[in-house]
Every structure is written in C-alpha cells, then in structure tokens.
Amino acid sequence: MQFSKMHGLGNDFMVVDAVTQNVYFSPELIRRLADRHTGVGFDQMLVVEPPYDPELDFHYRIFNADGSEVSQCGNGARCFARFVRLKGLTNKREISVSTQTGRMILSVTEDEQVCVNMGEPDFEPQTVPFRAAKAEKTYILRAAEHTVLCGVVSMGNPHCVMQVDDVSVANVALLGPVLENHERFPERANIGFMQVVSRDHIRLRVYERGAGETQACGSGACAAVAVGVVQDLLNENVHVELPGGSLHIRWQGPGHPLYMTGPATHVYDGFIHL
C-alpha cells in the first residue's frame, strides 16, 4: 500500500489514497501503524475515498492513533486538499468533500496555503454532545480537584475551551485527559487551553481526543476562537499561535461560517506491506 506522510504545523498524518487502492483498516491495524517505534507513526490517519454524493469531489475519513474514527480534523483537511492535488486525483483549487457529519469546502491558494470553510460553530449541548440543560456561554466543570470555567462547542467534533493566564505553564498533562473523559462529554472531547494575548491574538495548546497533546489542532483553534468571540474576548480575525506554528481564523459570529487558513506540508511518500 502506498501512503504519504504529511503534517499541518507538526500535527502529523499518514494519508492514504483509497480512490485508486483497495484498502481496509481495522482499529488494531491503525494502532500498529500509528506506533512511532514500530510503525509509521502519526497523530491521525487520513483516508481519501470516492464521493458518496456525485456533486462532491471526495469523502474524507479520519482515524485517531487509538484506532477510533472521528468526524473532523482541521489540520488534516488542509493536508487532504494538498494530497489530492499532489497525487493528481484532482487539479481543482476548490475541493468539496463529505465527512461523517457534513460537508466542507477546501480552497488552495496560489502559495499553496489552504483555506477551509469549517461551517458554523454549534453551541447546542445536544449537538456537541455535552450534558447540559441549555446552551450557555460558560460552564463550570469539576475535574481532578479543580474547578474549571469553560466554553463548549462543536466544530463537527466536541471541544471544551478554557482560558488560562499563561499557556506555557498550563497543566495540560493533568487536566487534558480528565476533561477529555469527563462524564458530561458522552463521546469524549478535545480540550483547549487558551491564553488571550489581545483581541486579535491567542496562544493555544490542545489535548486531542484519542491522540493526547499535539503540536497543533486546527479544529481546536477554530473552537477557541468561536468560544472567544461569543464570550466577547476576541475580534473576528484572530492569529492563533500553537506549539507547531500559526493559523489565521476568521469568524463573523453566529449565523456565519468560520474560516481557517494555514499551511500543509508533504514530508515523504512510502510503501508498506500490510
């Protein structure tokens, strides 16, 4: 099986063409391939499939390193767009894809940056999903003897975002896994630790569901800005600084789609016998 290794700001992926190759991945096989000592090593596996809808270009599947399938990965979406062009699966600069939960438009710029229409952030608890009687801008969660104030939003996957004074010393290793598996998130959640530098600039670390802390999380950056906008902490154009690099997020507020722009890097191509 042929594959490519790619990354979006250090969030790394094994990308597989299932349009021209016949492939099947069990959770056990994905876990083996994800192992950084004995496999390929990656945060997520991205699989390019033929479209289920003839009006779309591709179907986009995402698997975490633990073998679980998820419905959204923003950094992965940018790599997906670069991959299908690099491999000659399309020459379009505007690429339409379906995911587990909806549709996305991926736009490749002249300098090979990728702008992703991530859709409108959804704050309804039942959509996230999150156990709450009604939608609030802020919730109180208790975890590991800590009381946490956070915002909760779906970007096609569940996110919990808390504001911290200094992201460099945030206790991500402790609070990340505890909140990821909090009883109020029936499908677990991605946990964002956001430092507001100014109304146009945040620093962010994300503990990803099923992957742990990563160098960057595109949907996590989108979620942090969405929460920051509704809490009136941020303007509509925000520079998001992550450990692996920076993204630009634009959101005009409720009723509008959110846009994420950033790089996607091809590292190497490989072949593996399964």
UniProtKB/Swiss-Prot annotation:
Residues carrying the site annotation Could be important to modulate the pK values of the two catalytic cysteine residues: 159, 208
Top-level taxon of the source organism: Bacteria
Localization (cell): Cytoplasm
Keyword Hydrolase listed: no
Name by which UniProt lists this protein: Diaminopimelate epimerase
Site note Important for dimerization, residues: 268
InterPro entries, per database record: DAP_epimerase_AS (IPR018510), DAP_epimerase_DapF (IPR001653)
PROSITE patterns for the chain: DAP_EPIMERASE
Database matches in PANTHER family: DIAMINOPIMELATE EPIMERASE (PTHR31689:SF0), DIAMINOPIMELATE EPIMERASE, CHLOROPLASTIC (PTHR31689)
Entry's Gene Ontology BP terms: lysine biosynthetic process via diaminopimelate
An example Gene Ontology CC term for this record: cytosol
Pfam family, one: DAP_epimerase
Organism (species): Yersinia pestis
SUPFAM superfamilies hit by this protein: Diaminopimelate epimerase-like (SSF54506)
Residue positions binding substrate: 11, 44, 64, 74-75, 157, 190, 208-209, 218-219
